[in-house]
Amino acid sequence: MEIQVIDDAYLQCQQICKNASTTFYSSFSALGWEKRRAVHAVYALCRWVDDIVDGDEEPTVEISDELTEQTKQRDLMLRELHSGSEPSNPQEIHNQRLMALVSIRNKLHQAKEGKISPNDEPVFIALQDVFTKFSIRLQDFETIIEGMEDDLFPVMCNTWDELRSYCYKVASAVGLILIEIYGYEDRAARLHAIDLGIQMQLINVLRDVSEDYGRGRIYLPKDVLSSHNIDVEDLSNPNLPQNPSWASFMREYLEVVRRHQTSAVHLFEYLDPRSRVQPRIMLDAYTKIFDEIVRRSGDVFSAPLKLSVTSKMSLWMKINYLKIRAKLSAE
C-alpha cells in the first residue's frame, strides 16, 4: 500500500482523537512519532465502536449474505449468553449496530493478516500498519468488541467479579494494547495496566450511573447493593445520596477503587519517561474525578461529574512539565 494512503489514514485517526479530547490528545504528543500515530489509530477504533453502541454514530456497512449470517449467529450466541434477554433497542437498530460490530471484527482480522485495501476505512488502514510494527494481540481488540456487544443488551452486574470482568473488557483491554505500543521492561506491567483500566472504568460507572440506568445498564453490583439494603430501582432516586445505606455502599465501592489505584501507579515503573506521560495524565484526571466524588460524599446524582476548568488547566500544565522531563531524560 502506498505510504501516502497510510499517512492520510493516520491523519484522520489523529483528527478523531483531537476532536474527542484536546487534553488527552495533548498528552499523546510526548510519545515518539511512530508510537503516537499508533495510539491515535487505537483510540480512533475505540471511539468508533463506542459511538456505534451508544447511538452517537449511524453505522454503515456493506451488507452481504455472509455478514448477515454471521450477525444472525452472533445474535443467537449473545442472547444465550444474556439468558434469553431481548436487546435494549428495537430489533432493526439492534441488528444494525451488531452487524457493524461484526463487520469491524472481520476487518480487524483482515488488518492483522495484511489484507486491508486502500478503499477500506482509514482506521483499518492505520491499524494494519500498527500490527506490523508492534506486538499487539488481536485478542485484546476482540475483547473490547465483546464489551461493546454486552452493552447492546440490558446489563445487570451481580457481583464484584462481574463488574471487574466488564471493566476488563472495555478498559483494561485497551490498556493492554497501548502498553505494547509504549513498550515495557517487565511483564508485570500488564497486571498494573489491567488495574489502571479497572480503576478508571469503576469511576466511569459511578459518574454515569444515572445515564446508564436510563439505558437499562446496571453496572453497580446488585448483590453488593443489596448487602447495603439498596434496591436497583433506588438508583433512579435523585435523593439516594441522603440515604445512610448509600453512604455505606460508597465506602465499600471507593475502597475497591483505591485498591486498584494503588496497583495502577506501579505501571509507570516499567515505562520509559516519554511513555509514562499519557497514562499518568489519565490516572491524574480520573483521580480528580474520584476526589470530587469523595468531596460530594458520594453524590453522583445531583450534578454532572466532570473536570473543572481549573483541573483541566492543572492537567495541561502537568502535561507540559512531564513532556519537558521526558525530553531531558532522553537526551
What are these regions (language model features)?
Residues V205:
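Short, contiguous alpha-helical
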Residues M1-M200, S210-E331:
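Catalytic cores of Mg2+-dependent Asp-rich isoprenoid enzymes
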